[in-house]
């Protein structure tokens, strides 16, 4: 018989980029690993990450996460220089890199970070291939969300 995995309290999600889903149509999602330094892992365990303005850039055939902020802890070692907004290398397969690079360069898409989470002991980033929304698309999304809430409220009162 296999042993049950120990329950870990709390959520595996470190940070989410809610603004990305509002600003872009997400076409496809990928999971990527992150090349981190020791102080960054400590900060992520404390939940001190922000993905609000982050996106993926391509340099020398590799993908980098740009604009993600990981705030250093006060108790982190003093001999290490902590740069909270440094670009971090994304760990992707060659096939995934080529697919992302091709879509960004040819079809006018952009790649944004959607969320950061723990998968076992590894920190992962969910990135999405996205196309920008126009203002009227954003307004339509807001109207649809409000109608969903109103509909739920009406149905709740109708069952009484």
Swiss-Prot record:
One cellular component term from this protein's GO annotations in UniProt: cytosol
Origin superkingdom: Bacteria
InterPro entries: SmpB (IPR023620), SsrA-bd_prot (IPR000037), SsrA-bd_prot_CS (IPR020081)
Claim: DNA-binding is one of the keywords in the record: no
Classification via HAMAP family: SmpB
Main function: Required for rescue of stalled ribosomes mediated by trans-translation. Binds to transfer-messenger RNA (tmRNA), required for stable association of tmRNA with ribosomes. tmRNA and SmpB together mimic tRNA shape, replacing the anticodon stem-loop with SmpB. tmRNA is encoded by the ssrA gene; the 2 termini fold to resemble tRNA(Ala) and it encodes a 'tag peptide', a short internal open reading frame. During trans-translation Ala-aminoacylated tmRNA acts like a tRNA, entering the A-site of stalled ribosomes, displacing the stalled mRNA.
Descriptive protein name: SsrA-binding protein
Organism of this sequence: Pectobacterium carotovorum subsp. carotovorum (strain PC1)
Originating gene: smpB
């Amino acid at each position: 018989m296999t042993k049950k995995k120990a329950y870990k309290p709390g959520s595996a999600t470190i940070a989410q980029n809610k603004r990305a889903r509002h600003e872009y149509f997400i076409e496809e999602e990928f999971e990527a690993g992150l090349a981190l330094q020791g102080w960054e892992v400590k900060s992520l365990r404390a939940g001190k990450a922000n993905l609000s303005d982050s996106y993926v850039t391509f340099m020398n055939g590799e993908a980098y996460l740009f604009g993600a902020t990981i705030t250093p802890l006060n108790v982190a070692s003093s001999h290490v220089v902590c740069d909270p907004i440094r670009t971090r290398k994304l760990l992707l397969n060659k096939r995934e890199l080529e697919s992302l690079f091709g879509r960004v360069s040819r079809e006018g898409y952009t790649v944004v970070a959607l969320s950061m989470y723990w998968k076992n002991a590894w920190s992962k980033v969910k990135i999405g291939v996205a196309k920008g929304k126009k203002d009227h698309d954003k307004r339509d999304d807001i109207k649809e969300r409000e109608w969903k809430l109103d509909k739920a409220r009406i149905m709740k009162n109708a069952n009484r």
